[in-house]
């Protein structure tokens, strides 16, 4: 049996994204092989307080350790996330079941990891697991440079049965539209500057719960979209042509993969693991605000080039399909 220790985050709960959806999908395909334990990371979980959260994780770890049989494996989906207490989980399993294979997913950018742990603590935490699994080569390199060698580079999945392009993807009659999504390691001040310099282009700024309205005050070409249901967000994606990603870092993300699956041309910061997911056939790589402005204008004025990038985004998204991720996971666990 492969035991999956997963978390239900409010931001992705019930959506076709996130680790919970991924591993529910995997469990449904192979219920005799996978069994998932899910912690609710909404208010109910946090209201338990630090001690209560630890107790919940501790008892689950003890229960599974006592039930362990030779051949069983463990997947931890939020390793090195302090609120998950998965280091505690791994310690317990490793102490009671020293030969148990433990695969621990790490998908926070280095800046966030360093806010939570010293480099020595990260290196020590790697000793409790068989393999650390990342979603991008830049994070793998970062961990390798800390002296952590047991790292496997996977990729971020997308459910391209749900995230599909609009029927009129290549023959839009209206003006080009740009969508901005995601908050992790995003530079909203630069985004506001770009929007201000392109008054002829309309932008959907999907800000979620970020308090950034003041940055776009007076910009009539920007529609600010708060936290909305997944179907509504997909509507905005299907009404757009370009996915704009002004990032300080990326190690693989829902935004990049879902944007490609809906056939959006990618205009992205050339940082982190972005080239694991995009190349020059579907993306314009940028290193400054003026780069972004120039590339968006080029695409807005050249529909043939824009459609070419859209087509290649769709093609590349197939590589990161949820079914390909399932196959990759099976290979890792062998």
Question: Each predicted region: which residue ranges?
Answer:
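Conserved donor-binding/catalytic core segment of Leloir-type glycosyltransferases
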Residues: 170-186, 192-195, 204
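Conserved acidic donor-binding segment of nucleotide-sugar-dependent glycosyltransferases
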Residues: 280-290, 298-304
